[in-house]
């Protein structure tokens, strides 16, 4: 069964990169889905405690697991110049079983401004730094939260996606939120 690690909003935080490496080691994903805001903390966010964009660049560029990424509102052309993965697309989509998986950061497309999707499709986004897993109007709205700068008293977090479910895990790798997709067998 496919197993994807879903991460968002690293914001140049070495501690966020370390959490991602722990999650890779623990879950052995076949692919990483990176939902933007990779290196820069942005003018509205506090500086992460371990702000070290160069360390995050080295980490991302050393990943052996394939990465599919989209651009966040804090990502710029200069970031693309130093990263060896494409990060300039506002969205990416591909099939996951019978569903369409739509990846975006959340500042262009959002739950309030969805692309055309059909019932059962998966809309993955970051941007809010708030983990979220809900079905609304037949579409699954999935947000892994932030590995570096969580908001509204949520923990640092990441997501795990399979063809049957989405689970948000906290920095201790405990299940924080989850949703099983309808018409999908429950995971063991």
Give each language-model segment a name.
Residues 44-46, 79-82, 89, 113-114, ...:
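Short, well-ordered secondary-structure micro-motifs
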Residues 9-10, 37, 73, 105-106, ...:
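Fold-independent oxyanion-binding glycine-rich loops
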Residues 2-95:
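Core catalytic region of metal-dependent phosphoesterases/phosphodiesterases
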Residues 100, 107-177:
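Conserved beta-sheet core of the metallophosphoesterase superfamily
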């Amino acid at each position: 069964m496919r197993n994807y690690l879903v991460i968002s909003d690293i914001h140049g935080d070495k501690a966020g990169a370390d959490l991602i490496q722990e999650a890779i080691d623990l879950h052995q994903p076949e692919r990483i889905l990176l939902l933007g805001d990779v290196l820069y903390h942005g003018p509205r966010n506090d500086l992460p405690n371990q702000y070290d964009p160069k360390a995050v660049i080295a980490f991302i560029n050393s990943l052996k697991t394939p990465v599919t990424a989209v651009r966040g509102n804090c990502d710029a052309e200069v970031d693309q110049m130093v990263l060896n993965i494409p990060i300039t697309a506002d969205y990416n989509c591909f099939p996951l079983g019978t569903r369409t998986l739509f990846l975006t950061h959340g500042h262009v497309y959002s739950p309030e401004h969805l692309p055309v999707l059909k019932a059962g499709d998966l809309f993955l986004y970051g941007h809010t730094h708030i983990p979220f897993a809900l079905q609304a109007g037949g579409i699954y709205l999935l947000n892994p939260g932030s590995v570096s700068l969580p908001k509204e008293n949520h923990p640092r977090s990441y997501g795990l996606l399979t063809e049957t479910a989405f689970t948000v895990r906290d920095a201790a790798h405990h299940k924080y939120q989850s949703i099983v997709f309808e018409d999908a067998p429950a995971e063991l």
